[in-house]
Amino acid sequence: MCSIIGPVDIVLLCKVVDNFGDIGVVYRLARALSELLDPPDLRLVVDDLEAFRSLEPLVDAGLDYQSVRGWEVFRWRETEAAEKAFRAKPPSVVIECFACGRPDWLEALLFDAPLFDDPQISARDCLLVDLEYLTAEAYAEDFHRMPSLTRSATVHKAMFLPGFTAKTGGLILDKSFMSSRARATSLEGRLELRRELLSGALAASARALPPDAAERFWTCVFTYERDYSSIVADLAAFAEGRTMGGRPCVAPRPILVLAAAGKSQACFSSAWERAGRPFPLLELPFLPQESWDRFLLASDFSIVRGEDSWSRGALAGRPFLWQAYPQDERYQMVKVEAFLERLRPHFDASAFAPLAAAYRALNDRDRDTPATAGDESVLPLLEASSSLADGFRDFADSIISLGNLAERLVATLK
């Protein structure tokens, strides 16, 4: 990969495609980079500022240009403010997140030097970094840091792939997440975190919960649309201490389910209503990213989806299921099997078998709609959650040992 010498001015490009997953990763990366750069010389070019505002309330979705957290934030579409700023100060590094491409005005500025205010700018190199989606597939190691050509001798390009191995870029370890993770590692710290969450902005909703809400087995659900009847039934059986056949097996385990805002919330709540409200349910509003992190870290078991929450589930160090985005010809199963192979070394065979079965059942489908039922069973994982915890903790520790993706990216650029 071509290196940039001297101060690093970084531009992050983001087009919101899949709900908030894309901007979620970009926002987290921006925060992590700011923790490493002094000053945090970052410019963000985003096409959906409303989505950005949902994660970072300081963003004003009505402005084409603004300063947020010390960053310059530009709307994707061509604006006078963006062109003026980039003509006066060309970027040394442009990170294209998830193959989003470049705005037309930036494309012209990068590849048509006379457009810059300073005629000497044409001699300055620029590095385009193609930050790809997270994957556990082997190609992540093959393509990480691979250079490629552009139509300019002064504009270079290379790929940067997140991943779960030392030959990839790792995952983003932002300070806010890692600090909350450290608190949630112990049971005492997790209970303290839960009490804070329930007494904060959600205090009004939490008043309807049982008095022992913080001490219950917390399960967080954030996936795609589907019929959640079987998952609700398993959660109810676990709470009542019943086996899959309905026979008493273990002592009842009072639970609290957190239904995250998004595609899955209404579907899950509907299945819960049909089942007779068998356990307490807290419907979460859409939360700023750092608040969402804390709810996920406070949970004993999670079912997550997408990109950013998948990476946070992997780093949390507690049992979780991941639902991949459904693709044509069920290609998501290739991604799921690759991830299972990353998990496998951290579990013994007897524990891994039901875990793998649950991952496959959750993901092996052509589409997700509110009426799409599946045969997934989470009860075996819930019953084995204590024994599975060691394997997930070991897996998380192995990822953290790789280092911070943001730090590795900056080290590569300098």
Regions found by a protein language model. Give the residues of each.
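C-terminal alpha-helical cap of glycosyltransferases
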Residues: 398-414
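Short hydrophobic signal-anchor/transmembrane segments that target glycosyltransferases
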Residues: 231-248
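Active-site and donor-binding regions of nucleotide-sugar-utilizing enzymes
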Residues: 13-154, 262
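A nucleotide-sugar donor-handling region in carbohydrate enzymes
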Residues: 132-229
